[in-house]
Amino acid sequence: MGTHDGIRYMTSEQEWEQVLQIKTAGRDDSRSDTEHHPYEPTDYCVLERLANSGHIRKKNTLIDYGSGKGRVSIFMAYQTGCHSIGIEYDERLYEKALINGESPATRNRVSFVLGDAALYELPD
């Protein structure tokens, strides 16, 4: 682990995957086309900075469009205490997100929706 400005940061993707008890690593472009990008998880260092920015708090609900295997939703719920809804159109990635969402790190604050993000209606 490293520190910057007094904030603790993990040093590797593998460390975060172990802490969160999830499997989200690796690129998957098997279902990409002109309308859909490949699955490529957001780096944990980017998520650490976002979580520590103060923009997302416990009282917030994060909507993760194109949630893939659920890394952003799970990480942000773990780090900030927010609720998170991941929306994914690829059924294979959605199924993996559901498995990852069972992580004790989420404390039932994460849910996933299978569907087109453009058609998703935001909750009140």
Residue ranges of predicted features:
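Conserved class I S-adenosyl-L-methionine
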Residues: 59-68
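Conserved short alpha-helix immediately C-terminal to the canonical SAM/SAH-binding motif I
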Residues: 92-93
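Short conserved loop adjoining the S-adenosyl-L-methionine
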Residues: 119-123
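Conserved SAM-binding motif I beta-strand of class I
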Residues: 83-88
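Conserved SAM-binding loop
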Residues: 97-98
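Glycine-rich SAM-binding Motif I of class I
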Residues: 70-74
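S-adenosyl-L-methionine
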Residues: 1-57
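Conserved SAM-binding strand-loop segment of SAM-dependent methyltransferases
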Residues: 106-115
